[in-house]
Design a protein with these regions (language model features):
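N-terminal pre-ligand scaffold of iron-sulfur
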Residues: 1-58, 71-72, 76, 85-103
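Short glycine/proline-centered loop/turn elements that form peptide/ligand docking sites
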Residues: 80
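Short cysteine clusters
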Residues: 44, 63-66
């Protein structure tokens, strides 16, 4: 795995997200309400629409198009209409930046 800088930690207050392209992959980099950082694929599994603009609620993200909800840590589906999860990537905060690990 290789780690990439995905965002500045100060740019993501709790409950926020940002769309980023990292190593050619469209990602949502988010900070959950508890302050933890996460990265998931920027594609809802329900209708293949972007998650960009979705609300961060607790430790989940809600698709802005149809309301599907996904766990930010695991990518697991938490609410319909999606039935499949999304890809979640390991992240860490180090020296003021959010890093994401990609294969």
């Amino acid at each position: 795995m290789t780690d990439y800088v995905a965002a500045g930690a100060a740019d993501l207050p709790p409950g926020s997200s940002a769309c980023r392209t990292v190593a050619g992959r469209a990602l949502i980099v988010a900070r959950a309400q508890d302050g933890t950082y996460h990265a998931v694929a920027n594609r809802c599994s329900h209708a293949a629409l972007p998650l960009d603009g979705g609300r961060v609620r607790g430790s989940s993200i809600v698709c802005p198009h149809h309301g599907a909800r996904f766990d930010l840590k695991s990518g697991r589906v938490l609410g319909p209409p999606a039935h499949e999860g999304i890809v979640a990537y390991p992240t860490r905060e180090r020296d003021g930046v959010v890093e994401v690990w990609l294969l």
